[in-house]
């Protein structure tokens, strides 16, 4: 059984999708040890409780430095014998302590066809750009923002009559298929 921790900052829909894939047996030999969140009021906490997944709430402002924050996370992850970190809407850059402790073992999903539209509101950027195609990317995490090695991408059309909300739903649907598929191939 490979132990993973999932990091999320917001609603946690990708977190819950992964958990449901584990619970249904579609993601085999994986144990979700805990949800790690950096916001005490994040909806992902409710999703974790619904699935009886332990939750660690660690807000960086509780610590003297980013290094102290990450060292605390590394301690918790090591106590749970976590082997992989899966980022699912975690809105912080991963720093050197976590990167060093989990080198090559941190995945992220991003709602664009990287290297286009890194960072926040990637779907909005694609929508307003006039692009006709966008998608989702799973990549390894490095010290940059959405700059790690690309593992796999999935595409969808941006139709002229799509609203931004419709496009967000299309990309979310891609993510729900793509992320568990990549995790199944990579996390061993």
UniProtKB/Swiss-Prot annotation:
<comment type="pathway">
    <text>Purine metabolism; IMP biosynthesis via de novo pathway; N(2)-formyl-N(1)-(5-phospho-D-ribosyl)glycinamide from N(1)-(5-phospho-D-ribosyl)glycinamide (10-formyl THF route): step 1/1.</text>
</comment>
<feature type="binding site">
    <location>
        <begin position="91"/>
        <end position="94"/>
    </location>
    <ligand>
        <name>(6R)-10-formyltetrahydrofolate</name>
    </ligand>
</feature>
<protein>
    <recommendedName>
        <fullName>Phosphoribosylglycinamide formyltransferase</fullName>
        <ecNumber>2.1.2.2</ecNumber>
    </recommendedName>
</protein>
<dbReference type="GO" id="GO:0006189">
    <property type="term" value="P:'de novo' IMP biosynthetic process"/>
</dbReference>
<keyword id="KW-0658">Purine biosynthesis</keyword>
<feature type="binding site">
    <location>
        <position position="66"/>
    </location>
    <ligand>
        <name>(6R)-10-formyltetrahydrofolate</name>
    </ligand>
</feature>
<comment type="function">
    <text>Catalyzes the transfer of a formyl group from 10-formyltetrahydrofolate to 5-phospho-ribosyl-glycinamide (GAR), producing 5-phospho-ribosyl-N-formylglycinamide (FGAR) and tetrahydrofolate.</text>
</comment>
<dbReference type="InterPro" id="IPR004607">
    <property type="entry name" value="GART"/>
</dbReference>
<feature type="binding site">
    <location>
        <begin position="12"/>
        <end position="14"/>
    </location>
    <ligand>
        <name>N(1)-(5-phospho-beta-D-ribosyl)glycinamide</name>
    </ligand>
</feature>
<dbReference type="InterPro" id="IPR002376">
    <property type="entry name" value="Formyl_transf_N"/>
</dbReference>
<comment type="similarity">
    <text>Belongs to the GART family.</text>
</comment>
<feature type="site" description="Raises pKa of active site His">
    <location>
        <position position="146"/>
    </location>
</feature>
<dbReference type="InterPro" id="IPR036477">
    <property type="entry name" value="Formyl_transf_N_sf"/>
</dbReference>
<dbReference type="GO" id="GO:0005829">
    <property type="term" value="C:cytosol"/>
</dbReference>
<dbReference type="Pfam" id="PF00551">
    <property type="entry name" value="Formyl_trans_N"/>
</dbReference>
<dbReference type="GO" id="GO:0004644">
    <property type="term" value="F:phosphoribosylglycinamide formyltransferase activity"/>
</dbReference>
<feature type="binding site">
    <location>
        <position position="108"/>
    </location>
    <ligand>
        <name>(6R)-10-formyltetrahydrofolate</name>
    </ligand>
</feature>
<keyword id="KW-0808">Transferase</keyword>
<feature type="active site" description="Proton donor">
    <location>
        <position position="110"/>
    </location>
</feature>
């Amino acid at each position: 059984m490979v132990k993973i921790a999932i990091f999320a900052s917001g609603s946690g829909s990708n977190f819950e999708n992964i958990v449901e894939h584990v619970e249904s047996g579609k993601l085999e030999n994986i144990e979700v040890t805990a949800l790690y969140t950096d916001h005490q009021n994040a909806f992902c906490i409710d999703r974790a409780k619904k699935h009886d997944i332990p939750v660690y709430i660690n807000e960086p402002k509780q610590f003297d430095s980013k290094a102290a924050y990450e060292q605390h996370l590394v301690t918790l992850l090591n106590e749970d014998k976590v082997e992989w970190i899966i980022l699912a809407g975690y809105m912080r850059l991963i720093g050197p302590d976590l990167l060093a402790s989990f080198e090559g073992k941190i995945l992220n999903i991003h709602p664009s066809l990287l290297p286009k539209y890194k960072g926040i509101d990637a779907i909005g950027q694609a929508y307003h750009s006039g692009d006709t195609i966008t998608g989702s990317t799973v990549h390894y995490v490095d010290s940059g923002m959405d700059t790690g090695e690309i593992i796999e991408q999935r595409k969808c059309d941006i139709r002229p009559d799509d609203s931004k909300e419709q496009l967000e739903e299309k990309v979310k649907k891609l993510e729900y298929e793509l992320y568990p598929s990549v995790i199944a191939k990579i996390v061993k």
